[in-house]
């Protein structure tokens, strides 16, 4: 079984530019206030549907607040058969200072 990889925002952006799926595991209100453009909100309610419809081999970047919770979520996705999973170090807080123009508001992309 493969393991997830921890990456900095710059590598997450490079993967994103190549079409990686970005999932955000922060709470819904925080996600709606500001998130990475094109990211999908993932929580206990949307997780099953996300896994059912996902390409398990597609690069998938998991984002949280500071890069801690995303590691658990990334490990869970690997356990569900995802083969190319990344946890972004520094989380959205580091992302928004590194790539402020690559953010969006609203509940879905």
Swiss-Prot record:
Rhodanese domain ranges (all copies): 16-104
Which keywords accompany this UniProt record? Cytoplasm, Transferase
**EC top class named in words:** transferase
- Any Pfam family matching the protein: Rhodanese
The annotated active site, in chain numbering, is 64 (cysteine persulfide intermediate)
What transmembrane ranges does the database entry give?
Answer: none
Keyword Transferase attached: yes
Identify the Gene3D superfamilies for this entry: Rhodanese-like domain
Summarizing the function annotation, the protein's role is: Transferase that catalyzes the transfer of sulfur from thiosulfate to thiophilic acceptors such as cyanide or dithiols. May function in a CysM-independent thiosulfate assimilation pathway by catalyzing the conversion of thiosulfate to sulfite, which can then be used for L-cysteine biosynthesis.
Name of the protein in its database record? Thiosulfate sulfurtransferase GlpE
Top-level taxonomy:
Bacteria, Pseudomonadati, Pseudomonadota, Gammaproteobacteria, Pseudomonadales
Q: Which gene encodes it?
A: glpE
